UniProtKB/Swiss-Prot annotation:
The keyword Flavoprotein is assigned to this record: yes
UniProt GO molecular function: carboxy-lyase activity; flavin prenyltransferase activity
Protein name: Flavin prenyltransferase UbiX
Reaction catalysed by this enzyme: dimethylallyl phosphate + FMNH2 = prenylated FMNH2 + phosphate
Residues noted as binding FMN in the record, renumbered to the chain: 10-12, 36, 92-95, 127
Name of encoding gene: ubiX
PANTHER family in UniProt: FLAVIN PRENYLTRANSFERASE, FLAVIN PRENYLTRANSFERASE PAD1, MITOCHONDRIAL
A Pfam family annotated for this UniProt entry: Flavoprotein
Role: Flavin prenyltransferase that catalyzes the synthesis of the prenylated FMN cofactor (prenyl-FMN) for 4-hydroxy-3-polyprenylbenzoic acid decarboxylase UbiD. The prenyltransferase is metal-independent and links a dimethylallyl moiety from dimethylallyl monophosphate (DMAP) to the flavin N5 and C6 atoms of FMN.
Residues at which dimethylallyl phosphate binds: 157, 173
Keywords: Flavoprotein, FMN, Prenyltransferase, Transferase
Family: Belongs to the UbiX/PAD1 family.
Enzyme class per UniProt: transferase
Amino acid sequence: MKRYVVGISGASGIVLAVTLVSELARLGHHIDVIISPSAQKTLYYELDTKSFLSTIPQNFHNQIVLHHISSIESSVSSGSNTIDATIIVPCSVATVAAISCGLADNLLRRVADVALKEKRPLILVPREAPLSAIHLENLLKLAQNGAVILPPMPIWYFKPQTAEDIANDIVGKILAILQLDSPLIKRWENPR
C-alpha cells in the first residue's frame, strides 16, 4: 500500500479529483486529501454536494484522511514522512503561481513545496485556458524543478463518449505516471 496526497484547488474539474481518489482507494492505497475553500465551492457548483466524502464509495472511506488546508502541523507537511507522490488536481493557476514562488502558506501549497524539495513526484493538473505567458512561465519553472505538468486534455483517439470517459482517460494518465496498474490506463495500439 502506498501513500498519496491529493490536493484539490478551486479550479473547475473537481470530478477529476473524485475519480482519482476513488481509483487510488479501489487499488488499496492510503490517500490524504486537502481541499481548498475555493474547491469546496466548486464541489458544490459542479457536483451538488458540500461533502467530498459523499462523492466516494463508503467502503473506501477508511483509506482516506481529510486534512484542513490550515492544518500546517499535519504529518503530510513534513519531509520526514514518506509520501509516494503528491497530485494537485485540479490545480488552479493561483496555486501554480504560489508553488512556483515557493509560497507554502497553507497545507496544500506546503505539501507541493515538500515534494519539490524532497525530489518526490509532484503532478500538477492545471485547469485553465487560454494560458498567459505568466502561467506558462510558472509551469515551466515547476517542470524544470521536477514537477510533472499534466493538463487535463481529452484523449480524442480513444473516442470518448461521455464526460466520465474523458475524466477516466485523464485520471488514467495520472495513474500511468505513478506506474500503477489500473483499468483506467489505456494504451495506444496501431489500428489494423
